[in-house]
């Protein structure tokens, strides 16, 4: 679901941020670093991007980062890694449906579109910190209140692939040089940029989401990405497809996980029990103001989404994890996904940001997820503890920076002032998996002994 730009029709420097456009640049497949492509390499530049992402440290860490339900709870639940893989599969499916509908006229190099969307999907969650939404909120609140800075998962993903991931390094006139992250092509970087405006613009416009931090390294790469003119920054078609795939994967698959875990009372939702409808509608009012005129509208959406289950035996009572119930749940989620894929590619064109019926469906499904998986009262203690871990890790590393990795890089920012020092620490904490963050916190504060690395 696309975020509203900081001001109507504006991006980081005054361009149109809400307009998605095809990738029309002479050097769309250029990289910032020196390219030494092997002559016998059969891969396209975007396929090279995809392979670099898959083999990266940040991608591997997604296997131990929370999607919705904590990775430590049970192995069945999706992690950020499995969500990312499923998102990439849906992105390719949407791309192929559009190309089958003779959509080539609006896409440069249509033969690369599925690979480009897949690469964007694979990279889109690399910047998410430990503990899912709770970790992201904790880091953002900490930065806002203490230093007037921000944390945002999408901007962190951009920072990882353009700076932090140890893959490519550019030698400059100085002996230090500059890390280039994965050194991805312009095409892939543009496709992954869901919010083409900066941290400063987001703060000024009181907008939650943004795509790039306000520091010299990130801004320089962002300017290069748009041929030296960041005012041209805008969403791309591949980026819109990636967002559609992400929202569908998130909305449908987390409903499946929550139902299987018996956290979401699917039978009560199917039966439109008043208490369940009220909780969903109240959450939807808060997270999607103005989308629904009344709670009756939310109930109508629930009836449209779950009405087919009224006559299903497995959904008439609490989920029992029988093979029959598991098959019924899987069939329902598959049908829901197929329906959304059909709607998003209806008429042979991408129907996403302006597809109000589909956006309302997504909003209701996400509201269910927030009610029972993200903000349930039963998880208040766990979320409090996770926020505390995040805050105390940041404080501990700032107090004793000798515990940080990359000490040669820390030496260059140690006396540079709070913004650079703090961002360095945040980069490290955000890179941690759930389990590693908890382990380091225990050792840092003397509640456990041992050694580990990641």
Task: Give the residues covered by each predicted segment.
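A residue-level signal for conserved active-site and pocket-lining positions in enzyme catalytic cores
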Residues: 157, 390, 429
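Sequence-structural signature of the catalytic-core scaffold of metal-dependent phosphohydrolases
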Residues: 2-42, 50, 54-65, 85, ...
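Hydrophobic (often cysteine-bearing) scaffold residues that line and stabilize catalytic clefts
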Residues: 83, 131, 135, 153, ...
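C-terminal amphipathic alpha-helical interaction region
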Residues: 402, 407-449, 453-454
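C-terminal subdomains that position terminal phosphate/3'-OH groups for nucleotidyl transfer/ligation
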Residues: 280-420, 439
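A short small-residue
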Residues: 65-75, 368-373
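Low-complexity, highly charged intrinsically disordered N-terminal segments
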Residues: 78-81
């Amino acid at each position: 679901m696309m975020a509203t730009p900081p001001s109507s029709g504006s991006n980081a420097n005054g361009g149109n941020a809400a307009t998605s456009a095809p990738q029309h640049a002479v050097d769309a497949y250029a990289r910032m670093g020196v390219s030494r492509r092997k002559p016998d390499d059969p891969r396209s530049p975007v396929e090279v991007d995809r392979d670099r992402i898959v083999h990266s440290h940040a991608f591997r860490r997604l296997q131990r980062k929370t999607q919705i339900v904590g990775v430590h709870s049970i192995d069945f639940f999706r992690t950020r890694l499995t969500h990312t893989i499923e998102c990439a599969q849906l992105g390719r499916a949407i791309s192929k449906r559009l190309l089958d509908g003779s959509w080539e006229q609006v896409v440069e190099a249509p033969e690369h579109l599925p690979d480009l969307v897949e690469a964007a999907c694979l990279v889109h969650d690399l910047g998410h910190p430990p503990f899912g939404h709770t970790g992201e909120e904790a880091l953002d609140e900490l930065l806002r209140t203490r230093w007037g800075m921000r944390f945002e998962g999408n901007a962190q993903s951009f920072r990882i692939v353009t700076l932090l991931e140890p893959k490519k390094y550019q030698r400059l006139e100085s002996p230090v040089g500059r890390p280039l992250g994965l050194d991805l092509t312009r095409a892939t970087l543009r496709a992954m940029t869901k919010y083409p405006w900066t941290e400063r613009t987001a703060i000024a416009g009181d907008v939650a989401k943004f795509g790039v931090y306000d520091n010299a390294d990130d801004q320089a790469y962002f300017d290069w990405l748009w041929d030296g003119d960041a005012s041209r920054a805008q969403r791309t078609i591949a980026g819109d497809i990636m967002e559609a795939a992400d929202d569908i994967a998130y909305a449908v698959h987390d409903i499946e996980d929550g139902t299987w875990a018996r956290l979401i009372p699917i039978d009560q939702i199917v039966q439109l029990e008043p208490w369940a409808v009220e909780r969903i509608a109240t959450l939807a009012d808060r997270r999607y103001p103005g989308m629904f005129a009344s709670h009756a509208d939310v109930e109508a959406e629930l009836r449209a989404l779950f009405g087919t289950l009224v006559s299903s035996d497995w959904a008439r009572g609490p989920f029992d994890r029988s093979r029959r119930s598991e098959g019924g749940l899987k069939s329902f989620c598959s049908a829901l996904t197929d329906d959304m894929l059909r709607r998003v590619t209806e008429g042979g064109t991408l129907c996403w940001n302006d597809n109000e019926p589909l956006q309302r469906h997504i909003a209701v499904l996400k509201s269910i997820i927030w009610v029972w998986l993200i903000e349930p009262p039963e998880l208040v203690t766990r979320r409090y503890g996770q926020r505390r871990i995040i805050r105390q890790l940041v404080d501990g590393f700032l107090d004793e920076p000798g515990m940080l990795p990359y000490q040669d890089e820390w030496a260059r920012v140690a006396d540079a002032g709070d913004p650079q020092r703090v961002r360095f620490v945040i980069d490290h904490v955000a890179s941690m998996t759930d389990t590693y963050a908890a382990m380091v916190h225990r050792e840092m504060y003397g509640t456990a002994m041992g050694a580990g690395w990641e």
